[in-house]
Amino acid sequence: MKFSVLLPTRNGGAYLENCIRSILEQNYADMELVISDNANTDSTPQIVAMFTCDPRVKSLRIDQPVSVTDNWNNAFRASSGDYTLMMGDDDYMLPCCLERIEEILERNNQPDCIVYNAYSYVAPDSINGNAQSFYSDSHFRFGPDLRVERFIEPGERFEIVRNMFRFKVGIPLNMQTVLVGRKAADKIRGGLFQAPFPDHYALNSLLLTAERWVFSPEKLLVVGLSPKSFGHYVYSNQQGGGLAYLGIKDDFDGRLPGNVLLNGMHVWLNLLKQNYSELLQGVAVDRAGYVRRQVYSWFLQLRLGTITVGEFRRNFSLLSPSDFGGLLAAIVDRESWERLWHMLCSWNRSDAETQWRSLHSLNEVVDIRQFAQWLSHRGAVER
């Protein structure tokens, strides 16, 4: 069984070597690493050249910068494995990751997709210039119905997608935490990765169309956040920079200022509805859910000092009477209360910890490879 690890990169040279080493150090023979160099102008070409003597490495170079989505598709088209796994240049594959994935596949008779968990690591200077490292023991907080390894039935998967249209996320929307079978990927209408958020669109398309999904609670890698990540722009409230990073626009009727992820989500939800209208009959983007989440983002931006009181008030003037009516639903929405409570409890904490629940500061660790070693040492102590 062959694995293709996709590694599209754009000026991630400062982090790339650790990522590549973590992949090539895997004790698994039948794999390929496909690196797509998106017209990098930093040290990336020199770092990639260090590894091209390894026959498992397939290196591609794009001479003129393209969008994130186009670069991802470039890597995917060049791959040949039975299953693909995406990595960012600031991520890290933990030891035995591919062996453990193969075991999950064998236990479940080679499903189309596997969703699993990960650790999160925030590199210094990634969020508003905070020089501290942070980590989370769970990259994603799954619901109580996803605790042990099992199949996710088609009806459950449809409900996960339906809840996306309500702006409620039930699985991590990161390609790093989902293994995708090639046959399932090739069935996606319009191609696997589509703008504005290629991973979000791909995963929801697969939830709708792939025959067999398996959930595993195992943590197989570290999802990194660095000063060059898209997450850096989101958590540092640099919305314009985030859009430029992705090379997209998020304009649509009824668009509100606030969180760029929510506006991008609105766009790809409509694209999903357009491409799978027969599977999504009666499902539509929930305006009230969108407004509720954006209003929360305004409170958060005010708390972080990235908008003024005047801008905060002007944002509310953009809401229609029906939008205000929809906000009343927040009274009975548990997630809204949890978000508000977390923000209040984090009032005197760092910007990173205010925005990211379950985040912990980490001393004497300055990069993701050190964090992986710290995890290994901690595990040995706990055992």
Regions flagged by a language model, labelled:
Residues M1-Q238:
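Nucleotide-sugar donor-binding/catalytic module of glycosyltransferases
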Residues N117, K219-R383:
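C-terminal subregions of glycosyltransferases and related glycan-biosynthesis enzymes
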